[in-house]
């Protein structure tokens, strides 16, 4: 079996539902997680290792790998450095066939059921989104992020020297590099990404997700994860590799079988009864969510513009001093 390690950095107060995340990691006992953190994680599963590091120590570690001065003022900016983790933390991943990174606002299902050795053998990169991405652990793959994209994307030096979030771990960065180099990316639609703009269980629609249904939920059942929805009079059940829920909290409180609802986690003892699930939504909700999403994108653009102006003014100030 090919060995997999997932590298993460987490600084500051832990999420309220961090034990939900840890429990789903524990069920994937044949995959290792390595977390650099300044928090106290208590007892963790055998396959989850915590290395105590401060944010400044990680910043110094990253800086030591590059000759130019990097910009890394907040932990959130680490998302742009994730494609370089195989290069930055190379001494920790030597014995593994694949390394990767993931988010903490998610729950894993049976990862190995989807990512078999046959699939890992055929592909250079697994998935395109930052929720969960894996890379073949070779010297060539681990330094591929350094390749200049020209007009096809953002150069890593530009990404690593600005406060602006460039989403280098997704479409405008590492994925474009892999595609330009004819590297094979596995991107089957086997996960669920929940909308951050709705209290209800609303699935974000893109190339990797399903259509929404009037009654739908996600079920965690002792390490297995399912997308369950009602279509006409039929209840359908599809196994998924993970669910990502940005902007939401799902504290399972140690339960081994539960569903996700708009009010949090709901314990399941027998079969799902839709009348007892507070999860129905109207399609008008989706339209409202689209407006919220547009507003969110506008705010991000304004924030990035302000960040760029501050950098330009700082450079002008330094030039004046000289």
Predicted features by range, described:
Residues 1-20:
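N-proximal low-complexity "stem/linker" segments adjacent to membrane-targeting elements
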Residues 22-32:
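Short, acidic, metal-binding catalytic loop of nucleotide-sugar glycosyltransferases
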Residues 31-41, 52-53:
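Short beta-strand/loop segment that forms part of the nucleotide-sugar
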Residues 42-92:
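Active-site-proximal specificity loops/subdomain of glycosyltransferases
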Residues 82-127:
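GT-A fold catalytic core of metal-dependent nucleotide-sugar glycosyltransferases
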Residues 124-140:
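Short beta-strand-to-loop element that shapes/binds the nucleotide-sugar donor at the catalytic cleft/hinge
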Residues 144-285, 289-290:
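Catalytic core and acceptor-binding pocket of nucleotide-sugar-dependent glycosyltransferases
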Residues 265-322:
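C-terminal non-catalytic accessory extensions
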């Amino acid at each position: 079996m090919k060995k997999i390690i997932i590298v993460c950095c987490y600084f500051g107060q832990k999420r309220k539902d961090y034990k939900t995340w840890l429990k789903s990691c524990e069920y994937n006992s044949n995959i290792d997680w390595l977390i650099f953190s300044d928090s106290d994680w208590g007892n963790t599963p055998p396959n989850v290792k915590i290395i105590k590091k401060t944010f400044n120590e990680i910043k110094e570690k990253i800086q030591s790998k590059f000759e130019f001065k990097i910009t890394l003022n907040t932990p959130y900016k680490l998302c742009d450095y994730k494609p370089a983790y195989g290069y930055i933390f190379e001494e920790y991943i030597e014995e593994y066939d694949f390394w990767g990174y993931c988010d903490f606002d998610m729950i894993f299902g049976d990862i190995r059921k989807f990512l078999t050795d046959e699939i890992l053998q055929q592909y250079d990169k697994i998935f395109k989104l930052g929720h969960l991405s894996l890379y073949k652990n070779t010297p060539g793959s681990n330094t591929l992020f350094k390749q200049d994209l020209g007009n096809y994307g953002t150069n890593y030096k530009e990404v690593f020297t600005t406060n602006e979030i460039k989403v280098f771990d997704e479409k405008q960065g590492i994925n474009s590099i892999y595609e330009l180099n004819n590297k094979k990316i596995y991107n089957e639609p086997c996960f669920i990404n929940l909308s951050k703009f709705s209290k209800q269980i609303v699935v974000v629609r893109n190339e990797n997700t399903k259509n929404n249904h009037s009654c739908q939920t996600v079920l965690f059942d002792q390490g297995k994860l399912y997308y369950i929805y009602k279509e006409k009079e039929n209840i359908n059940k599809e196994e998924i590799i993970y669910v990502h829920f940005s902007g939401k909290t799902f504290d399972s409180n140690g339960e081994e079988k539960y569903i996700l609802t708009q009010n949090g986690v709901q314990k399941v003892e027998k079969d799902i009864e839709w009348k007892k699930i507070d999860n129905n939504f109207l399609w008008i909700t989706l339209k409202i969510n689209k407006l919220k999403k547009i507003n969110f994108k506008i705010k991000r653009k304004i924030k990035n513009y302000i960040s760029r102006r501050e950098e330009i003014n700082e450079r002008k100030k330094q030039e004046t001093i000289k």
